[in-house]
Amino acid sequence: MKKILKLLSIVIMLTVATIYTMPTKVMAFGPSSDEIYNGIDVSGYQGNIDFGKVKKDGIQVVYIRSSEGTNYIDSKFEQNYKRARDAGLKIGFYHYVTARSVNQAEKEAQFFASVISEKVADCRLAMDFESFGNLNKREINTIGLAFMKKLEELTIKEVVLYSNAYTASRIWEGEVTKYPLWIAQYGVYE
């Protein structure tokens, strides 16, 4: 019995790993655009990036993490923005949401909007909300929706929901699903 459970666990892990590395299409631009772009997301975790090489490798769009919570600006935000813009890449911004209430979500949207206010975004703004702590499904959806609505209100820009495949299929529901979905592909470094 233990061998069967162990084998089943391995099969499940391999299936999940395969799902996370499958290519997906992203609608980072408006629905009137049928063109598909190759893109990446970047943050301070990647260190110094040669965006000229990135462009030469066929990447057309770079989503840059600008902020997290209500007071953290990504350590490479300004540098990534300038270098990606200088390389002629299309740019989008994303914010890593840490809110645990609607009030906090709205404050995070205000912070995100203020951080990117002097920058030019070629793509929709993105909400990256993936660390839920003890929140239940209803709370997650309420907080995510509050963030996206407040962000749209403040910026007059469309928003996309950045999510992994598991969360997209099991957590997001209701009004949140009216927003376009950008499925993350963790572990893809080509």
Language-model-derived ranges and their functions:
Residues 2-27:
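Sec-dependent N-terminal signal peptides of Gram-positive bacterial secreted proteins and lipoproteins
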Residues 40, 54, 84, 127, ...:
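Conserved, mostly hydrophobic/aromatic
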Residues 110-125, 130-190:
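Surface-exposed substrate-engagement region within the catalytic domains
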